[in-house]
C-alpha cells in the first residue's frame, strides 16, 4: 500500500482537544452504549474467525469505551489526535493491558502490519481522510480481523418542539464553527458525513471481504442530527459499497428520560455550543419549552462491521 502525507486539518483537529472539564461533561451528556452494542461487535468478530489479542481504539478521546474492550481483548491500544486526551485516558485506565499513542487515525507507521485483531472507531471516522484512513486501518488488521466503526451521540427527541430547537442549535453552532474554520471546505465534508445515515468508510473489495454490515439503529425519524447548516451545499461521495448489506433496526436500550439539566449536558457535550453567540437565545427557547417536564428520546446509531481479507 502506498504511503501518503496526512493533511493537517487545523481547527478541525482541535475540536475535541478540550480538556478535563469538557470530557467530564461529555461522559454525562453522551449516551452510554448498551451491552447489546458491544455484544454485537464481539459476536461478529468471533463468528468471522477473529482473535481477541489486540484491539486498536482509534480516535478514542479519553477512552470512554476502552475498559469494555479490555474485558475481551488482552491488549488495547488507545490513540487520539490530542495528546491531552491520551494523558487523561492513561491517568484513568493505567497501563495494565493498555498502551497509548497520540496520532491521527491515518497515522500508524509505529504499528506493525497485520498486528491488530480489531480496529474500533467510534464517533471519529467522519473527521478522517476516508481513503487514507481505511488504507491504514486495513494495513494494521491481520487477515480475519474486524473493522468496527460506530457513530452515536446526537439525540432524537420525542417532542417535536424540542427537536426543532435542538436542530437549530446544531445548525447555528455549525455556522459558528465554519466562520472560524481554517479550512471550511474540509469541515463541511466532516459535517456532511455525520448527517443522517453516517456516510463513511469506503471498503476496498481487495482489502475487505464482501457483505460488510451497515446497521442503522433507531433511524425511523431521520437519522443523526448534524451541525451542517441546511443552506450549505455539499458534494460528498456515497461510501456504501454495492455488496454491503444495509439493515434498519429499532433496538431497545437506546432510549432515555431526562430533564432540562440533562439536555443541557448533552448539548454542551458538542464543542460548538459554548462558542456560538446565538446559543444563549436558543437555549432560553429550550428552557421555556421544557421547564420542569421530563424529556424523552432515543439515540440513533450507526454500526459498520467488515472483515479483513
Curated annotation (Swiss-Prot):
It comes from the Eukaryota. One of its GO terms (molecular function) is S-adenosylmethionine-dependent methyltransferase activity. Residues 57-149 are annotated as: Methyltransferase domain. Its EC number is 2.1.1.-. CDD domains: AdoMet_MTases. Keywords: Methyltransferase, S-adenosyl-L-methionine, Transferase. It holds the Pfam family Methyltransf_11. Secalonic acids show unprecedented anticancer activities against various human cancer cells and might be interesting for further derivatization, targeting diseases such as cancer. The keyword Acetylation does not apply. Gene3D superfamilies: Vaccinia Virus protein VP39 (3.40.50.150). One of its GO terms (biological process) is methylation. Pathway: Secondary metabolite biosynthesis. Methyltransferase; part of the gene cluster that mediates the biosynthesis of the tetrahydroxanthone dimer secalonic acid D. The pathway begins with the synthesis of atrochrysone thioester by the polyketide synthase AacuL. The atrochrysone carboxyl ACP thioesterase AacuM then breaks the thioester bond and releases the atrochrysone carboxylic acid from AacuL. Atrochrysone carboxylic acid is decarboxylated by the decarboxylase AacuI, and oxidized by the anthrone oxygenase AacuG to yield emodin. Emodin is then reduced to emodin hydroquinone by a yet unidentified oxidoreductase. Belongs to the methyltransferase superfamily. This is Methyltransferase AacuQ. It comes from Aspergillus aculeatus (strain ATCC 16872 / CBS 172.66 / WB 5094).
Amino acid at each position: 500500500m502506498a504511503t501518503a502525507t496526512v493533511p493537517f486539518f487545523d481547527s478541525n483537529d482541535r475540536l475535541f482537544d478540550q480538556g478535563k472539564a469538557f470530557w467530564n461533561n461529555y461522559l454525562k451528556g453522551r449516551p452510554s452504549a448498551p451491552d447489546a452494542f458491544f455484544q454485537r461487535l464481539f459476536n461478529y468478530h468471533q463468528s468471522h474467525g477473529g482473535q481477541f489479542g489486540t484491539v486498536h481504539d482509534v480516535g478514542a478521546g479519553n477512552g470512554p469505551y476502552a475498559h469494555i474492550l479490555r474485558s475481551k481483548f488482552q491488549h488495547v491500544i488507545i490513540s487520539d489526535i490530542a495528546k491531552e486526551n491520551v494523558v487523561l485516558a492513561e491517568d484513568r485506565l493505567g497501563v495494565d493491558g493498555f498502551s497509548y499513542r497520540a496520532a491521527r487515525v491515518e497515522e500508524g507507521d509505529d504499528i506493525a502490519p497485520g498486528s491488530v485483531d480489531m480496529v474500533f472507531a467510534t464517533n471519529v471516522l467522519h473527521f478522517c481522510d476516508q481513503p487514507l484512513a481505511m488504507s491504514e486501518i486495513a494495513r494494521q488488521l491481520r487477515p480475519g480481523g474486524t473493522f468496527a466503526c460506530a457513530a452515536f451521540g446526537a439525540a432524537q427527541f420525542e417532542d417535536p418542539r424540542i427537536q426543532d430547537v435542538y436542530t437549530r442549535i446544531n445548525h447555528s453552532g455549525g455556522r459558528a464553527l465554519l466562520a472560524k474554520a481554517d479550512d471550511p471546505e474540509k469541515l463541511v465534508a466532516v459535517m456532511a458525513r455525520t448527517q443522517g445515515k453516517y456516510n463513511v468508510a469506503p471498503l476496498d473489495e481487495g482489502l475487505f471481504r464482501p457483505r460488510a454490515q451497515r446497521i442503522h439503529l433507531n433511524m425511523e425519524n431521520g437519522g443523526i442530527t448534524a451541525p451542517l447548516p441546511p443552506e450549505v451545499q455539499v458534494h460528498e461521495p456515497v461510501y456504501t459499497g454495492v455488496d454491503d448489506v444495509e439493515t434498519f433496526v429499532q433496538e431497545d436500550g437506546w432510549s432515555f428520560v431526562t430533564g432540562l439539566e440533562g439536555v443541557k449536558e448533552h448539548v454542551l457535550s458538542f464543542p460548538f455550543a459554548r462558542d456560538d453567540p446565538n446559543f444563549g437565545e436558543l437555549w432560553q427557547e429550550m428552557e421555556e419549552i421544557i421547564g420542569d417536564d421530563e424529556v424523552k428520546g432515543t439515540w440513533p446509531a450507526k454500526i459498520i462491521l467488515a472483515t479483513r481479507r
